[in-house]
Amino acid sequence: MTKATPRRRRWRIGELAGATGVTVRTLHHYEHTGLLAASERTDGGHRMYDRESIQRVHQIRALRELGFSLQEIRRAMDGRTSLTDLLRKHLQRIEVQVARATQLRDRLRNMTTDGDVRVSVDQLPAALDAMSKVEKRPQPRPCTCALAADREERWRRIRNDLRHCMDRNEHPCSDRTKAVALEARTLISEIAGNDLTGSTILKVLARLSDPRSLAGWDPHLMQYLDSALVALGDQPH
């Protein structure tokens, strides 16, 4: 006597949700987008799913966790798109997102690491806008060692001259102090462009510059230069 072939197990949609860790609503959405189909229906019209359905849901979840859209997942699972090509394109998107996240991290770090600088809500848009302008500027060709060394030397000289003015209690509006500030503004413009002014320039420059070139630039000296730059006003470069 031939034994009856055992009936393959089937799961109702609620059971499938419990077995795969997704909600019934999500499974309905997968069906609506063509990602999932019931293996059969009961006489009462209830959807039933098999082991292949469970495997497919796990595959969909894995691709979703990688950040793919449902449309991309459907093309890959239907064989219309190479999964390898899809992964490569997704990797490019992730790299862009990582770069943006890194910029955001640096902005937040720049605005919070200096305990002597208080960023108010009113200053926040200007600070973020200034940083964004610097980030969006076309990247210059790498400067030669001679040019880099010259800028570092000029920056050190400006720092020393400005420190001398401050130690002598010269007012930031004095001719000597403004002359040094003008040299500083010229150098800052070479690095950050002419569209940034005042204290925002200093905050951005202080964060973007090589820390070694900022040795000796304590908050008091930076504030002194800030005041001198304000005193320059619209004086031509």
Swiss-Prot record:
Residues 10-79 form the HTH merR-type domain. The keyword DNA-binding applies. Keywords: DNA-binding, Nitrogen fixation, Nodulation. GO terms for biological process: nitrogen fixation. It comes from the Bacteria. Pfam families: MerR_1. InterPro entries: DNA-bd_dom_put_sf (IPR009061), MerR-type_HTH_dom (IPR000551), MerR_fam (IPR047057). GO terms for molecular function: DNA binding; DNA-binding transcription factor activity. Residues 13-32 bind DNA. PROSITE patterns: HTH_MERR_1, HTH_MERR_2. The keyword DNA-binding applies. Involved in genotype-specific nodulation of soybeans. This is Nodulation protein NolA. It comes from Bradyrhizobium sp. (strain NC92). The gene is nolA.
